[in-house]
Curated annotation (Swiss-Prot):
Catalytic activity: a beta-D-Man-(1->4)-beta-D-GlcNAc-(1->4)-alpha-D-GlcNAc-diphospho-di-trans,poly-cis-dolichol + GDP-alpha-D-mannose = an alpha-D-Man-(1->3)-beta-D-Man-(1->4)-beta-D-GlcNAc-(1->4)-alpha-D-GlcNAc-diphospho-di-trans,poly-cis-dolichol + GDP + H(+); an alpha-D-Man-(1->3)-beta-D-Man-(1->4)-beta-D-GlcNAc-(1->4)-alpha-D-GlcNAc-diphospho-di-trans,poly-cis-dolichol + GDP-alpha-D-mannose = an alpha-D-Man-(1->3)-[alpha-D-Man-(1->6)]-beta-D-Man-(1->4)-beta-D-GlcNAc-(1->4)-alpha-D-GlcNAc-diphospho-di-trans,poly-cis-dolichol + GDP + H(+)
Membrane topology qualifier: Multi-pass membrane protein
InterPro entries reported in the protein's UniProt record: ALG2, Glyco_trans_1, Glyco_trans_4-like_N
Highest taxon above the source species: Eukaryota
Full protein name: Alpha-1,3/1,6-mannosyltransferase ALG2
Length: 503
């Protein structure tokens, strides 16, 4: 007797804008991991530019459907959070109206939670996971009274809609602590599912190999900092520590990061860092990678011969990988990072990491001095203090000479166990297994909401059309053909019949 076929679970991701940011990388990795584990996966998004997305999306490995891209992302440069929520609600409405809403066993939503109640009400047999990268209300700027007032309803909406999810995931224990302080009225204990890094090595472009030969001579050693050119990244910590270190004469410091010519902070901050380097008597040079890639022959190696600091802007992913592979140490300067993916990208190559002892690095980096016999060490965690950092730079030289293989072994091992795509998808898989059979139970809001909505619509219709009965027949048609709600259809037909035949 043949066995019955096993049901293939269907998972839908709902994400606002499928670009190339950190949140998008997590969604793509989670989707690909679950797909490889046997799930039927679809990503729904309000926007996806196939020329500006990750390879798994570009080459069709993952199924992506766009809904609502025609809706505006802002109104005269303002109201972006309002537009983002409306775009997500439209996307969800489209799933409801087309009947796709009931096709999926699990919905995984991130960044915006406004659609969660609609999923809860219209897909009662599905489960909803919400992945919180960080509370949105803590990321929003509140300059002035009007902006503070404008944010209030969205803060309330975020807390309520997030609490409707069947389970909530966060990207680190640090975010979990912030979540608990921010959403104190939610009796929720989020589960930590760490983001991952791709353990496969990216192909290095010949152009980037040639550039490395130009900027490094005679096997010169260098430290590396990778961050966006933003003041909150505290890149001056790396520069000052390097200036105070004895290694300034034998090493270089490469500052690499995202840089937008249309972003005034990026431009101003780079100038501030260059000024700091000059004040510290460190010779420096700036290389714009986009300009270099257009005319590599116009960039001779003599430009870099005496430079102690090299500021690199907008480098390719290929050059970034090459820089990480060859550096002596990654200097990760931000404080209170929600997670921080760059240390993982360094550790996968066996590169030690020096990071600030707050936020995500506390969970990703194993401090050299905090482990017995330095077992499992992957770097150093220190306060955001240049003196402390310069000491590590000097002390690390002897450590590398005696036992550099320690980091070469420990980094990749830790990545594979905790931060690989397989590890992350396994955590998602276990979470889905846990909630898929869990009874949702009855919630007061979900019981009252449909009735309150029907009453509101009926009251508004009565005010607008008076005793006319035809609007209710129209509402019945909309409920059946658009909303596909049998209960609402029957209700409006009863109202229609009552108005027509009660007199």
């Amino acid at each position: 007797m043949s066995e019955a076929p096993v049901h293939q679970r269907k998972v839908a991701f709902i994400h606002p804008d499928l670009g190339i940011g950190g949140a998008e990388r997590l969604v793509v990795d989670a989707a690909a991991g679950l797909q490889n584990a046997g799930y039927d996966v679809t990503i729904y998004t309000s926007h996806c530019d196939k020329s500006h997305c990750f390879e798994e999306v570009k080459n069709g490995t993952l199924k992506v459907e766009v809904r609502g891209d025609a809706l505006p992302t802002h109104i005269f440069g303002k109201f972006s959070i309002l537009c983002a929520n409306l775009r997500q609600l439209y996307l969800t409405w489209n799933l409801i109206s087309t009947g796709k809403i009931e096709e999926y066993d699990v919905y995984i939503v991130d960044q915006l939670s406004s659609c969660v109640p609609l999923l809860h009400l219209n897909a009662p047999d599905s489960k909803v996971l919400f992945y919180c990268h960080f509370p949105d209300q803590l990321l929003a700027r509140r300059d002035g009274l009007l902006k503070k007032l404008y944010r209030i309803p969205f803060d309330i909406l975020e807390q309520f809609t997030m609490g409707v999810a069947d389970t909530i995931l966060v990207n680190s224990n640090f975010t979990k602590q912030v979540f608990a302080k921010t959403f104190q009225s939610l009796a929720v204990d989020p589960k930590v599912v760490y983001p991952c890094v791709n353990v496969e090595q990216e192909e290095i472009l010949p152009l980037d190999k040639d550039l490395m030969k130009k900027i490094l001579k005679n096997n010169e050693k260098y430290y590396l900092s990778i961050n966006r050119y933003e003041r909150k990244k505290n890149i001056e910590l790396a520069i000052t520590a390097f200036a105070q270190s004895k290694q300034r004469t034998s090493h270089k410091l490469f500052i690499s990061g995202g840089y937008d010519l249309n972003n005034s902070e990026n431009i101003d901050y780079l100038k501030e860092l260059e000024t700091l380097a000059t004040e510290l008597k460190l010779k420096h040079v700036h290389l714009s990678y986009p300009e270099y890639s257009k005319s590599p022959d116009k960039c001779p190696s003599s430009n870099f011969a005496d430079a102690q600091i090299l500021f690199l802007t907008s480098v390719s992913s290929s050059l970034k990988e090459l820089l990480l592979q060859s550096t002596e140490m990654l200097l990760y300067t931000p404080s209170n990072e929600h997670f921080g993916i760059v240390p993982l990208e360094a550790m996968k190559y066996g590169v030690p990491v020096l990071a600030v002892d707050t936020g995500g690095p506390l969970e990703t980096v194993v401090d050299y001095n905090e482990t017995p016999s330095h077992i499992d060490a992957t770097g150093w965690l220190r306060p955001s203090d240049a003196d402390e950092w310069s000491k590590v730079l000097d002390q690390s030289v002897d450590i590398f000479e005696k036992n550099h293989s320690l980091f070469e072994v420990n980094g990749p091992k830790r990545i594979k166990y905790y931060f690989s795509r397989e590890a992350m998808s396994k955590n998602f898989d276990n979470t889905i297994d846990h909630i898929i059979w869990k009874s949702r139970g009855t919630r007061l809001w979900s019981t009252l909401a449909p009735g309150l909505l029907m009453f509101t619509v009926q009251y508004a219709t009565l005010l607008i059309t008076g005793d006319a009965s035809w609007p209710y027949l129209l509402l019945a048609a909309i409920s059946y053909f658009v909303l596909r709600s049998v209960k609402a259809t029957v209700y409006w037909i009863i109202v229609f019949c009552y108005l027509n035949y009660s007199t």
